[in-house]
């Protein structure tokens, strides 16, 4: 049974056309498990860099690289609060996108597990 979040379809919606390379790049920004983990954490509320480091369980420089990517790609906003940077998601469609992706991944888990063309976390092609 398909997830309820997939009941509607945007396939016929009127949206601005983007080049396939732009859309692929949009998804590549989320293709890293650490970035996705950080994004899901930030979706639950504004976070500092230190909170993101603790949550991700990796070094501050690595978290900084991932957060910079999320900011540069427009998924996350950063604001300075004294010496701290605080990260948040301003566009509610980002939460919708992540939820849709999770629903699709759950619905297609068996196929994704069998897919040999896209490596899983820690695997190399």
UniProtKB/Swiss-Prot annotation:
Hg(2+) binds at residues 69, 73, 114. InterPro entries: ArsR-like_HTH, HTH_ArsR_DNA-bd_dom, HTH_MetalResp_TranReg, WH-like_DNA-bd_sf, WH_DNA-bd_sf. The gene is merR. Residues 49-68 bind DNA. This is Probable mercury resistance operon repressor. Negatively regulates the mercuric reductase merA and the organolyase merB in the absence of mercuric ions. Residues 15-109 form the HTH arsR-type domain. PROSITE patterns: HTH_ARSR_2 (PS50987). It comes from Streptomyces lividans. Keywords: DNA-binding, Mercuric resistance, Mercury, Metal-binding, Repressor, Transcription, Transcription regulation. GO terms for molecular function: DNA binding; DNA-binding transcription factor activity; metal ion binding. GO terms for biological process: response to mercury ion. It comes from the Bacteria.
């Amino acid at each position: 049974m398909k997830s309820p979040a997939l009941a509607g379809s945007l396939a016929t919606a009127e949206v601005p056309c983007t080049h396939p390379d732009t859309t692929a790049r949009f998804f590549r920004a989320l293709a890293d498990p650490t970035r996705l983990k950080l994004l899901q954490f930030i979706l639950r509320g504004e976070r500092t860099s230190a909170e993101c480091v603790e949550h991700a369980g990796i070094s501050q420089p690595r978290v900084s690289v991932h957060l910079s990517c999320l900011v540069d790609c427009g998924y996350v906003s950063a604001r300075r609060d004294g010496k701290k940077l605080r990260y948040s998601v301003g566009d509610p469609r980002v939460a919708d996108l992540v939820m849709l992706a999770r629903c699709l991944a759950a619905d297609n888990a068996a196929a994704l597990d069998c897919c040999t063309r896209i490596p899983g976390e820690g695997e190399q092609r």
